[in-house]
Amino acid sequence: MKPRARGWRGLAALWMLLAQVAEQAPACAMGPAAAAPGSPSVPRPPPPAERPGWMEKGEYDLVSAYEVDHRGDYVSHEIMHHQRRRRAVPVSEVESLHLRLKGSRHDFHMDLRTSSSLVAPGFIVQTLGKTGTKSVQTLPPEDFCFYQGSLRSHRNSSVALSTCQGLSGMIRTEEADYFLRPLPSHLSWKLGRAAQGSSPSHVLYKRSTEPHAPGASEVLVTSRTWELAHQPLHSSDLRLGLPQKQHFCGRRKKYMPQPPKEDLFILPDEYKSCLRHKRSLLRSHRNEELNVETLVVVDKKMMQNHGHENITTYVLTILNMVSALFKDGTIGGNINIAIVGLILLEDEQPGLVISHHADHTLSSFCQWQSGLMGKDGTRHDHAILLTGLDICSWKNEPCDTLGFAPISGMCSKYRSCTINEDTGLGLAFTIAHESGHNFGMIHDGEGNMCKKSEGNIMSPTLAGRNGVFSWSPCSRQYLHKFLSTAQAICLADQPKPVKEYKYPEKLPGELYDANTQCKWQFGEKAKLCMLDFKKDICKALWCHRIGRKCETKFMPAAEGTICGHDMWCRGGQCVKYGDEGPKPTHGHWSDWSSWSPCSRTCGGGVSHRSRLCTNPKPSHGGKFCEGSTRTLKLCNSQKCPRDSVDFRAAQCAEHNSRRFRGRHYKWKPYTQVEDQDLCKLYCIAEGFDFFFSLSNKVKDGTPCSEDSRNVCIDGICERVGCDNVLGSDAVEDVCGVCNGNNSACTIHRGLYTKHHHTNQYYHMVTIPSGARSIRIYEMNVSTSYISVRNALRRYYLNGHWTVDWPGRYKFSGTTFDYRRSYNEPENLIATGPTNETLIVELLFQGRNPGVAWEYSMPRLGTEKQPPAQPSYTWAIVRSECSVSCGGGQMTVREGCYRDLKFQVNMSFCNPKTRPVTGLVPCKVSACPPSWSVGNWSACSRTCGGGAQSRPVQCTRRVHYDSEPVPASLCPQPAPSSRQACNSQSCPPAWSAGPWAECSHTCGKGWRKRAVACKSTNPSARAQLLPDAVCTSEPKPRMHEACLLQRCHKPKKLQWLVSAWSQCSVTCERGTQKRFLKCAEKYVSGKYRELASKKCSHLPKPSLELERACAPLPCPRHPPFAAAGPSRGSWFASPWSQCTASCGGGVQTRSVQCLAGGRPASGCLLHQKPSASLACNTHFCPIAEKKDAFCKDYFHWCYLVPQHGMCSHKFYGKQCCKTCSKSNL
């Protein structure tokens, strides 16, 4: 049959982490330290001088922190991680630590102890990839550095500190709450540390001065991008004034099944072997803590949302909240969530299918986790799957389901599992709700008397009453019912105490503001609703996304969330900041009710009385009452008349009138069942060969079996002693005397070893009437059979050559247990007493290995002595005095004793005569004077002989305190106050001399020094030793690079040649000149002309500086010019090509005076166009010797000259070819 399941949808919450004071975060802070991928950018806090708060208000105290002993005497200023100093201390040991903070306004003496119980011994974090395990991480004992405790000087105070690097944490008193942090070095100047005489190492400031609203001193950390911001809203999304309810198991009732109406099929290996325990877990472990050894699995989607570096801290934070919910006083039990392992899934795993379909995913996960087992064969009690998908209970797509779990599956190998959707810190409520289903809890208002709208953890919809979640009375009853079954025995395992993986000491709402909580519930664009209507976010967080509408999921803002100016949420109420809200009210028991009527009129029934935790009820996180809610006792123990109907048979007969599978049957008891089923009503139909369990439990007071005093109560077989006291360990001795010593009877023994003919009965022993403790057994396996008859030859066992089956046979006033196996000797056992004489015979079938027998008979005069009536008396038990003198205390407690010998339940004694108990003073006389010595100071030297001292004073303890007295009153001589220490020789060490001067005055150079191995004993002169002697440390460097200053780069000077000048004549033959000039080349590639003497140190290139030129032949006058009225005009031909590409060239053209296309005269000379023109006058580069290996090594070298980087050492060399061309 498929297990029934339950689901829950709860709050999504992402919160705000306050920036640490002056950008200084504690080294061991467990909160996230950086934004996850995809999160908004992280703004840097402003410099310290710009921050408001305690730094500017002066509401701080600079304190010195140091370790002291339990008397408050100084030990050391070195406060390091305590476990790292004492690695031999096991994790399970609760280690004490005493610290003192001393400042100008505060002097705190703290008594601390290590935390425990969240993670189990051997806790590991295992990462699984495609090919299996990728990594396994542990939490080493030395990494646990968290302490809790109180202040000696303040009542009702509490301290929670981390000692990982310095001291960080919170100190709470009735007057104020304080934060303690290491003093950042870069704030020392601002706080005036240098001006003070002492050396404070920490800063202590009130929590009321801590910044609250998001601002310059906060860092927004987004560890998950919520996909719902981009999804369409459900039809029930809340509009302004129309609240949207969150359904834990979805809105469709057909997918919210009821508990199984029939017994589930139980696989042989479904429960641990301890399931066969007969006793109730609640009674066998009444005042003990029940531990749920929990395995947590995180899927791939959730890993992607949070990141591998943050997921472990996030999950442990969630489970820490779950642990607190199960320790809430309203649950009515003492349940501890102990995490045994964390599995991180980076890739899909074979056999595990995770999808939006919650039902299918749960089925796959339950099967997958059932195969997980430790290397030593150990298994977890409970498995939790955390998924980043939006799951749905009835389809493979997102909907309003948050969780799914089988009902009453706890401790089952295949059904103790849940699936939970990640919704931020509200995930803790989902896990608690689904685990509640695993404990057998049903939704409030569904088949029970509790109301749906009370705002409890098991409500069908997620809506806290006044922002407070608790367990309803129905949930408490379901849990009590489950813990009363044998199935819950797996929770009796007691993990060894471990040190707790500590979390940030601040409240969640202080770490994450309301805007961030809205983002996790409604997406990236959501923020706290600020529209014009008043809503109390401490009862329901209202958020705004778009338009003029606000929405809520009826989850209150997290504890510590700012709800107004100088106000915060505490316990569902908006109270003044620093107030704790409503104080917790611890529950107390009401008076016992009267005893109920006896469940039977004879034969031993059960009566009970109860009390309620209602005087008052626990509220606001108060503890539930300790102890049992019900007390049981046996009643009407006299035997029933002989003609009365057997009590179990009467219960079977009640079903005769009820139809079973379509017809009526006559039922009678069937008792051949396993021990764990003795208290179920198994009946067999008369005339048929089938039997059936007609009820899961018989009526209270029904004997577990015919031959046992034990009775069934609530379906559990409870032990009854021979003194007819429920739960008593009293047993009869072999004489049948309750708690006897075997002295009231005579034990008869014998051994029958004769051999006879086969297939005949032979007499072995005659057992008289009244015999007890009868035992007849073969010495070895044989083919013969033990037979029993009475004196009238009536056979009860194996008579008339007929062999009976092994089993229980009732005859002669007692029950005989007959056992026979093919590989075990035959034996017959009975408790007695018998009411007739029995004759034991042997049906001989072959060789006789020997048959032993024994029984007891009462001594004369002891048979009919009636048992004495027990007496019940109060007794006082005093503890040892806490001190031997000087005033101490001792504890006085009461106990109820039977016959002043055996302690029993206190309900048997008269409550009116109950003695007064508590703490009483003792040993008030003054102690004799004695020497009081303090701890030795640190040695003045670490080696070579030093000294240390300690305070020594003569004191006397009087009235719980010590007072100094004259030293003459103490025994002499006085203890030594000074002693030698560290007398061992100092090891040799390296001695390094001063560094020599740098080899270069500019640029990179080298310097050296002398290094030698020398002795370090302070009592002798240092001696040079061979280098091989100094082996404890590496030899210091003898050479190192040095740079005094950078060298100035030389100017890049070079000779440049000018362009050729114009020809000295305009026609015929002339000359041209050019000049060498000194120039400096800029990075951009341009040149600046300098005086020639600047380049005097450079060789001048050998170039031609003068050359001949002939622009055009000079024109000749025509021999004849015709006279006429027309005058010629100047005509010019196109310019010729430039005579040089650089350095100055000449272009020429022909200029003629023409008229009508013929040469003419009369052209005006001053109008004649120019016949030559200078061209390409820019400098020519000096021809340099080309590097045979000059080439480009990258395809982007063309960009180097464009950006003026050819002068760069790297780029100029790698792009040599391109840079050389750019200079042309």
UniProtKB/Swiss-Prot annotation:
Binds 1 zinc ion per subunit. Its cofactor is Zn(2+). The gene is ADAMTS16. Residues 496-585 form the Disintegrin domain. A motif (Cysteine switch) lies at residues 247-254. Keywords: Cleavage on pair of basic residues, Disulfide bond, Extracellular matrix, Glycoprotein, Hydrolase, Metal-binding, Metalloprotease, Protease, Repeat, Secreted, Signal, Zinc, Zymogen. Expressed in fetal lung and kidney and in adult prostate and ovary. Residues 586-641, 874-922, 927-987, 988-1048, 1051-1115, 1127-1181 form the TSP type-1 domain. Pfam families: ADAMTS_CR_2 (PF17771), ADAMTS_CR_3 (PF19236), ADAMTS_spacer1 (PF05986), Pep_M12B_propep (PF01562), PLAC (PF08686), Reprolysin (PF01421), TSP1_ADAMTS (PF19030), TSP_1 (PF00090). Glycans are attached at residues 156, 310, 741, 780, 835, 905, 935. One of its GO terms (biological process) is regulation of cilium assembly. This is A disintegrin and metalloproteinase with thrombospondin motifs 16. CDD domains: ZnMc_ADAMTS_like. The active site is at 434. It is found in: Secreted, Extracellular space, Extracellular matrix. One of its GO terms (cellular component) is extracellular region. The spacer domain and the TSP type-1 domains are important for a tight interaction with the extracellular matrix. Residues 747-873 are annotated as: Spacer. Residues 31-53 are annotated as: Disordered.
